[in-house]
A protein has these predicted regions:
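Flavin-dependent oxidoreductase catalytic cores
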Residues: 1-214
């Protein structure tokens, strides 16, 4: 059985986080249908530190048994370090996930999400800060790269491993692709072969036959 930082994952399918989609009700339904785990919608670390009420509501954990992760996004290591224990305290989550893959304009224009794949040293500092501050495993969600001219998923995955991340989740598209076209599973294979932590594949999963990449 695969484990994330010592946490057994009771299955091969984990519901990926998506803002505006994977809310509490949707996660609960997917859990009841067999998902081994689920991750919250992405939560602003800055808003969590400021104790925003709407942000806190995103942290609510579904009652169905299974792994639960809270996904944080931000660009300041100190803010991430302050938000990590708050997220754990308010949600009772099993692990924290760092968003370094969101492609939406308002996020990347602020230097967050997939923009961090253009500043790998900063990404590494954010991961290190989260790992140090959290008392649960930390994972990292990333993409293939910014565009096909700057593919850096393997490099960022190695940095994540070096800084103490327990697993990485790789979306096989670049930021330039957004959600169009098919995900590149070859880059996910490359990441899997490059690091000795669990690698979760994400993107273009349309049937149960597509759930494992070797």
């Amino acid at each position: 059985m695969v484990s994330i930082g010592g946490l057994p994952v009771p299955g091969r399918l984990i519901l990926a986080p998506m803002a505006g989609v994977t809310d509490l009700a949707f996660r609960s339904v997917c859990r009841e249908l067999g998902a081994a785990g689920a991750v919250s919608e992405m939560v602003s670390a800055q808003a969590l530190v400021y104790q925003d009420g709407k942000t806190k509501a995103l942290l609510r954990r579904e009652r169905v048994p299974g792994l639960y992760g809270v996904q944080l996004f931000g660009k300041d290591p100190e803010v991430i370090a302050r938000a990590a224990p708050k997220a754990r305290e308010l949600s009772g989550c099993d692990y924290l996930d760092l968003n370094m893959g969101c492609p939406t304009g308002k996020i990347v224009r602020n230097g967050e999400g997939c923009a961090l794949m253009r500043d790998l040293p900063l990404a590494g500092r954010i991961i290190a800060a989260a790992v140090k501050a959290a008392d649960v495993p930390v994972t990292v969600k990333l993409r293939k790269g910014w565009d096909n001219g700057s593919v850096c998923a393997v490099e960022l995955a190695r940095i994540a491993r070096e800084e103490g991340a327990a697993a990485v989740c790789v979306h096989g598209r670049t930021r330039a692709q957004m959600y169009s076209g098919r995900a590149d599973w070859d880059i996910i294979r490359e990441v899997k072969r490059a690091v000795d932590i669990p690698v979760i594949a994400n993107g273009t999963f349309l049937s149960r036959r597509m759930r494992r990449i070797s």
